[in-house]
């Protein structure tokens, strides 16, 4: 990888490889969602989808001082993890109207920050709809399908609601890695709760299958090279 040495950071004593490896993507991308979200102290945040990146965005929102963190998720095991990482309220999109429920939770105002962590057009539209005027939609999902991503015109304030849309790619660099490791060293967050499956290197193919097909209620798969 070109420039890989620019991302080298010393892993502090006491931090396991399993903990540290989360800095490479999930932790950095999820926290970026909170950072780009301009979350005010005591602000309201909705994190749409509680996969690994969304869970770290939830943790990041709590660390940034959000007063109310709303997690949107339908899978019970991920709802439980969302609670662990800082979601105050869970909204199950399979059972209730997400937009209506979030407006109810925020007194009809909408949230200061909506973090889109799935990468789907419908989720992005929901993020725009639940964000208050002057708020921020922070996008950390990967939109790998479809020709367009649609902005709902009315909820966008017909272009006049001053809703900021922020996007980004997993940030790296030595200083970034050192900051993330400091968060882990001081036990601000424990990403290993997301590790649902462990495989030896000899079973790499099965590890990829479980991860790709989301088998056995998987969240994150760890492959060990200790053989």
Question: Model segments located where?
Answer:
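Mid-domain Rossmann-like dinucleotide-binding core that forms the NAD(H)/NADP(H) cofactor-binding site
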Residues: 7-96, 100
């Amino acid at each position: 990888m070109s420039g890989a040495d620019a991302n080298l950071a010393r892993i502090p004593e006491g931090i396991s490889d399993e903990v540290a490896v989360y800095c490479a993507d999930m932790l950095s991308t999820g926290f970026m969602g909170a950072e780009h979200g301009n979350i005010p102290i005591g602000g309201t945040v909705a994190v749409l989808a509680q996969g690994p990146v969304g869970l770290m965005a939830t943790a990041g929102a709590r660390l940034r001082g959000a007063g109310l963190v709303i997690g949107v998720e339908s899978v019970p095991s991920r709802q439980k993890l969302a609670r662990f990482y800082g979601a105050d309220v869970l909204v199950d999109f399979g059972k209730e109207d997400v937009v209506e429920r979030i407006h109810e939770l925020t007194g009809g105002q909408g949230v200061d920050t909506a973090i889109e962590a799935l990468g789907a057009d419908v989720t992005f539209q929901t993020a725009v709809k639940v964000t208050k005027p002057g708020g921020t939609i922070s996008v950390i999902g990967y939109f790998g399908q479809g020709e367009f991503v649609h902005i709902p015109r009315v909820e966008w304030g017909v272009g006049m609601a001053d809703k900021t849309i922020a996007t980004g790619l997993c940030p790296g660099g030595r200083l970034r890695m050192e900051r993330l490791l400091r968060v882990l060293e001081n036990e601000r967050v424990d990403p290993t709760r997301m590790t649902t499956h462990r495989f030896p290197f000899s079973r790499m193919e099965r590890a990829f299958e479980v991860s790709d097909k989301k088998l056995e209620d998987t969240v994150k798969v760890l492959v060990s090279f200790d053989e």
